[in-house]
Design a protein with these regions (language model features):
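Ser/Pro-rich intrinsically disordered low-complexity regulatory regions in eukaryotic proteins
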Residues: 372, 388-389
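Unchanged
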Residues: 2-358, 390-666
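Long, charged amphipathic helices and adjacent flexible linkers at domain junctions
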Residues: 360-375
Length: 666
């Protein structure tokens, strides 16, 4: 058997085992679980959205209820770095465990850093990459997200550690078997996997000291430098930093000491390490001092998450003195898989042309799609029967209705398209702002929001420079006080409704290609506009979540009815709802569909719903199964009566001939 096939079989079985661990964590009180699961967020709005997602899962019994959950936003919306966010986590746990010498002792803690801006995949800036879709339907019928994958995949880890904190990066999916882990330690342990040097040069790489401890941490180094350092083995592979790191309770206590006085969190010390100026990095500032070959002089020169300045210099000195005596073990897992949700193009390719690479995990191009069609990827999308979607396009939380045409390779997210044509290789992402106004952002799939003008900045198949020249747009019209990155360019008009916002986005596209009329250019110029950055910060996160739920309900209802229309037995058709079953909202949608359906489909809908309600003993708004059952048989009765009545002879000319007629039996 080939290695790749064995590797995939192992990972598939590992995932199935993790799912069983996950189900046990929901049902068994004595199953060892995480004591804390803590997420970090970029601002209060994103934190509220994360908390709503967690609460929704808790209400549905989809998360272990004994675990303590928390979401910690960067303070006042200031970017404090992943290290600053980690200090917030340490402070929070210390506050939850008052009067304890070491609050991390005998505590199993999972931390997911998910507070980035998602500049390289802007459609996830508002709601965060953490709850972005994964192209898989979970065994209970739900469409999966990165968060769900983390929860399932890490369910077996608590039983493998006595105490400590596992820190994960919110944009990396790591697949492994928890039985591969033995993290009984006081310092740190980095989880690594073997990957080709071509992959490693774009990420962090660990250099093994020969005794399975980290000798050196190499972040985004050239292939040549990695080879010079001896980080590349004979097979051309490196020990890749997966973003997953264990911190023992002793190391955590040492870090807590930096922000404490006499065992109590000191606000002055805390703010020295958690602020926008220092912007401490978890990976750069916490891991570097733990490598055995690290020096304080080189530590000062390490690239910063923000800027190298005096505030960071002082923090690094104190961090070094506190934790350099600890070491970092290297846990190189094999078989294991590292999936990075990086740029928009990488995401699109992952869910379209490369999705077959993960068939062993039941990944597929379409998850929760109303009317299945071939050739494109979709997640929670309602695609009309007459709509045309181009090859390798990706639709996510979107409506595509009427005679709409979507170009090849285009990404559509949170947008409703009806009876219009969308070009290929672009991204359309709709945002509802706080207050109800709408913005539709448009950019090219390969565009990099981190690119800076006046350098050549790719934009919608041309360049931002060319866009400005052709339409007479000045630098001052796009940027006010911000730096001249595409990320900050005020390109997207604020509109009263979604359709107008979509129309204005298409005007931006026409302007990029020199096809906009003077009137259209003037409409754009006179409008109030936002950038990728400002629009995500002003987004109504609750509206995002409501749209996702609204779409999911409509898609599930449509899938169920589609199955019935294709002649599927009702019990099989009901499986689209998974273990969640039929919610109150879906029940209402199905009744509305039944009202409009032709006879055969109508009675099948009523019959299926009534059987489901009877079996599950479900009552919706006081309506019992027998009422729906009666609707089914009343419909049949009415149709039979109507059809029979049609066949009766015309009695319009009948008259009473006699007052009485006597009939005698023989």
């Amino acid at each position: 058997m080939k290695y790749e096939k064995m590797n995939n079989l192992f990972l598939r079985q590992s995932y199935l085992d993790s799912w069983e661990d996950y189900e046990r964590s929901l049902k068994k009180k004595k199953f060892i679980k995480w004591d804390y699961i803590i997420l970090t967020a970029s601002n209060d709005a994103q934190a509220a959205a994360y908390q709503n997602q967690i609460n929704d899962r808790l209400e549905k019994g989809l998360l272990p209820e004994d675990t303590h959950y928390a979401v910690l936003p960067d303070p006042d919306g200031k970017r404090v770095g992943s290290g600053g966010a980690t200090f917030q986590v340490l402070r929070y746990i210390a506050q939850q465990e008052p009067g304890v010498e070491n609050p991390f002792k005998e505590r199993r803690i999972l931390v997911i850093h998910s507070g980035g801006d998602s500049k390289r995949v802007p459609q996830y800036s508002a709601i965060g990459k953490l709850f972005s879709p994964v192209p898989r339907e979970l065994p209970d019928g739900r469409g999966s997200t990165l968060f769900d994958e983390f929860i399932v995949g890490m369910s077996g880890v608590p039983s493998r550690i006595q105490e400590g904190m596992l820190v994960l990066s919110g944009d990396v999916l790591l697949l492994f078997n928890p039985l591969q882990i033995d993290a009984q330690l006081d310092g740190a342990a980095a989880i690594s996997i073997k990957e080709p040097v071509e992959t490693g040069k774009n990420h962090g790489v660990f250099l093994n000291d020969g005794h399975d401890y980290v000798k050196c941490f190499l972040h985004k180094q050239t292939e040549e430098h990695l080879r010079e350092m001896g980080a590349v083995n004979e097979a051309g592979n490196v020990d890749l930093d997966t973003g997953a790191v264990f911190f023992g309770s002793g190391l955590l206590q040492a870090l807590l000491g930096l922000i404490s006085t006499d065992g109590q969190v000191d606000d002055v010390k805390f703010h020295q390490f958690c602020n926008e100026e220092a912007r401490i990095s978890f990976y750069g500032d916490f891991l570097y001092p733990l490598a055995s070959d690290s020096t304080l002089e080189d530590f000062y020169k390490e690239a910063a998450e923000g800027e190298l300045n005096e505030a960071l210099h002082e923090c690094r000195t104190k961090i070094w003195n506190a934790i350099h005596s600890f070491s970092m073990k290297l846990l190189c897992l094999s078989p294991a898989e590292f999936i990075h949700f990086g740029t928009t193009r990488e995401l699109r390719d992952l869910v379209t042309r490369n999705v077959q690479d993960y068939e062993f995990l039941d990944w597929k191009m379409q998850v929760n799609v109303a009317v299945p069609k071939e050739g494109f990827a979709a997640h929670n999308a309602y695609v009309g029967r007459h709509a045309e979607v181009g090859k390798e396009a990706y639709l996510e939380n979107a409506y595509v209705l009427g005679n709409a045409k979507i170009g090849e390779g285009t990404v559509i997210s949170h947008v409703k398209i009806k009876n219009c044509e969308i070009p290929g290789q672009i991204v359309l992402h709709g945002i509802e702002l706080i207050g109800g106004k709408k913005v539709v952002r448009i950019y090219g799939v390969p565009d990099n929001p981190k690119a800076k003008y006046p350098n050549e900045v790719a934009f919608l198949g041309t360049t931002l420079n060319r866009f400005m020249e052709m339409n007479g747009v000045t630098k001052e019209e796009l940027w006010k006080d911000e730096e001249t990155y595409l990320w900050f360019a005020d390109l997207y008009p604020i509109c009263e409704d979604h359709k107008t916002a979509l129309d204005m986005a298409m005007i931006v596209y026409k302007m990029a290609h020199g096809e906009a009329s003077e009137e259209e250019i003037q409409m754009w110029r006179s409008s109030e506009r936002m950038s990728l950055y400002s629009s995500f910060n002003a987004a109504d996160i609750d509206a995002f979540c409501e749209l996702n739920t609204f779409l999911e309900n409509h898609v599930l209802a449509r899938r169920f009815i589609w199955n019935l229309e294709q002649g599927m037995f009702y019990q099989e058709a009901l499986k689209v709802f998974g273990k969640r079953g039929i919610s109150e909202e879906i029940f209402r949608l199905l009744l509305e569909e039944a009202e409009e359906a032709e006879f055969s489909l109508k009675i099948r809908i009523y019959h299926a719903i009534s059987r489901y309600m009877k079996k599950t003993r479900t009552v919706y708004s006081g309506i019992h199964y027998d009422a729906i059952e009666s609707d089914c048989y009343d419909t049949i009765q009415n149709v039979i009566y109507a059809e029979t009545e049609k066949k009766l002879p015309d009695n319009a000319g009948y008259r009473i001939a006699k007052d009485r007629v006597d009939i005698e039996l023989p």
